[in-house]
Amino acid sequence: MYLYIETLKQRLDAINQLRLERAFASMSDVFKQVYGLIPVLLHYHHPQLPGYIQGNVPHGTCFFEPDDVQRQWVNKLTNASCDEPMNGYTSGELPITGIYSMGSTSSIGQSHCSDIDIWVCHQSWLDQDERARLQRKCLLIEQWAGELGIDVTFFLIDENRFRHHASGSLGGEDCGSTQHILLLDEFYRTAVRLAGKRLLWTMVPVEEEYHYDEYVNSLYAQGVLTPNEWLDLGGLGELSAEEYFGASLWQLYKSVDSPYKAVLKSILLEAYSADYPNGKLLALEMKQHLHRGEIVNYGLDAYCMMLERVTRYLVSINDLTRLDLIRRCFYLKVCEKLSNEKNENEPAGWRRQVLSQLVTQWQWDHERLAILDNRDSWKIERVRNAHNELLDTMMQSYRNLIRFARRNNLSVSASPQDIGVLTRKLYAAFEALPGKVTLVNPQISPDLSEPHLTFIYVPPGRANRSGWYLYNRAPDFAHIVGHQPLEYNRYLNKLVAWSYFNGLLTKDSQVYIHQGDSSCDEIKLHELVRDISSHFPIRLPAPTPKALYSPCEIRHLAIIVNLEVDPTERFSDQVVHFDFRKLDVFSFGEEEQCLIGSIDLLYRNSWNEVRTLHFNGTQSMLESLKTILGKMHQDAAPPASVEVFCYSQHLRGLIRTRVQQLVSECIELRLSTNRLEPGRFKALRIAGQTWGLFFERLNVSVQKLENAIEFYGAISYNKLHGLPVKLGKDARYLPAVIDGFACEGIIQFFFETTEDNNVFNIYILDEANRVEIYSHCEGSKEELVKDVSRFYSSSHDRFTYGSSFINFNLPQFYQIVKVDGATQVLPFAGGSFGKLSDLGKTAPKEEMSTKPIQGFNDYQAVHHH
């Protein structure tokens, strides 16, 4: 046994040394410096070293001895000798037990732009303050590396973390509550030991994995291994189907921003789930090769092993389309441009040699290599094809995931809040809605700019659909005829926004227009482009998990007036009588004409979605106002900016100012915190008619007011909306705390427990914020959540991309609770968040009423419109 263990240690050290050499090979001098000094900076703590803070900061790594280069560097900076080892150096009792890099570092997937993920494994006896100081030290080292242009992220890992199934929070690379064993799987197969103890897990044969602790204890009992010499993070025991689900959802979350990087991992998890529960994790395959002395896959390269496993899976299900895609993703990740001939005198690196062998096996020709190598020059047509292909692949993985959940009758182990955040990000990125600007270039190509863009208007009655067409060509007959347009939309605002936010339209683009009988000419178009580019940055930081879990709010809003229809055009060739003292742009002159002919809305919300809406006609101001205000729940933050762009031929400044004043006043009324005035209203005269905007608790309604009696009657009626609604014998109010959560466009359920804990009330707000109230309900809230989720997932499929049908925006569930005497709304967190296995099942609509909760149908629903 002793000789067997010694042989394994030698193999393990040899593989680790190979990975270290590969991590340094072909990398920049700065990368080599940072990567090589990380162990030194964590081992020592000195005012002259990066990462120093005052106080008792845990430092020192078990069994670490700096090499000559590291020692010289430290001695030079500190003017002191670091030749003497620390106390406890050989006992394994220093605070840091091991320093490991993980991920693509040292693999064929490492490139000059790769970041470095470092696990700093520490003793479990560090207290909270000590961990906080060590975390601060790591943060300062990250900042030092960042100043040198190297992206390093440290993760503090308690050596008992995985034994206790502890999890981080969503948003970090440790994936929130959605991963545990799978995170350890990735670490074990990609880890490179920079300093500290060896990993005990590698010494345990695969066949003993399910008896991990017993086998380890037997090795200790025999004296073959000494406990303090090894880092023991635990075995890769039995995985739950819930963890597969959570991890796969997390990979889809990451694929929104980095599709080429994440799609390979997504399909690996799909391959795992296909073999569940009898499959073998990739780390176990690697360990089996190590124990057998089989140094396969180009030196047990973690990235090549992942590709090989995914290839086996896709071939087994005859999915050659996705197989071709993951090979291209792999090729692009490696970043070795094989179509560029190397100098004969320059030796080819190991990564280039491996990739050359692979593309030969795949039978790729030079033309395909040239296209992939030229990705930095891809333009919109190729990028959009790539985006749709990646999207179809992700949706295929999502559908397979739902089938897996249904097959295994899942209740998800991820917290409801994490699942809500994950699905919201997918919804924001992928759900196709009218007016939403689809962003087609998530890190596919760095530059989609076009030198020439032509917007052509086709009026009604022609062979082609009426509306606007966009071409990436100059506007001459030869360039346009016979070529497909890049994009079409009925309204110019949407088309300009699409070209701008996708990076086609830049300050260097030549923009042309063929306006037909539209009011928008070349001058207006250039003004619109200038206004949008001045007020809307293309890139913003990704939305935070908190923003994704909250109702979406308008952040930046532009109100575009008279772009396509301009009533003031007729003032150029006729006499118009009006009173300068009564310049009302909404009811102008003797004819009381509304000078607002069209309004386009362009806004970005807190989920980073970009939306456009179009209104035309006399009522466009009223309709757009109601729409804007309806998208603001009462507790929403005011938009960071509200801009009015006006393109009227005449009275432009007056119209812009009046619209700005009106919108600002209405937003203030909508978001005012004074809820003692449920009857707040705004009267507005448009084209000789008086309208009332009524600011109610949950929405804003509009009513035409023909005379004084109707006017004051409407105001009085509106105030009555604030009074309680009676159900049965008891008065049931809509709790005021709900107001801050009411959000149009989504179904919301609020559960309120009564003094009798066996019964509860339900308040349901539909997508238009109409209210249904059910009182004295009995039964299982969890079952209701499950049934409602299943109902909406099967009957509200609005997401359409090719053959994909996914609805991410499921109903949201909350509970109204008392905390320290104050009423609060919290995410519903019952025994489970519904069974995700039911998502995607086809259920008849009446299923919800065939198994009602007791009391759920005992009271008539009251609707507020």
UniProtKB/Swiss-Prot annotation:
Residues 1-540 are annotated as: Catalytic. It comes from the Bacteria. Residues 546-865 are annotated as: Regulatory. One of its GO terms (biological process) is cAMP biosynthetic process. It catalyses: ATP = 3',5'-cyclic AMP + diphosphate. Its main location: cytoplasm. GO terms for molecular function: adenylate cyclase activity; ATP binding. Its EC number is 4.6.1.1. It holds the Pfam family Adenylate_cycl. It is found in: Cytoplasm. Keywords: ATP-binding, cAMP biosynthesis, Cytoplasm, Lyase, Nucleotide-binding. GO terms for cellular component: cytoplasm. Belongs to the adenylyl cyclase class-1 family. This is Adenylate cyclase. The gene is cya.
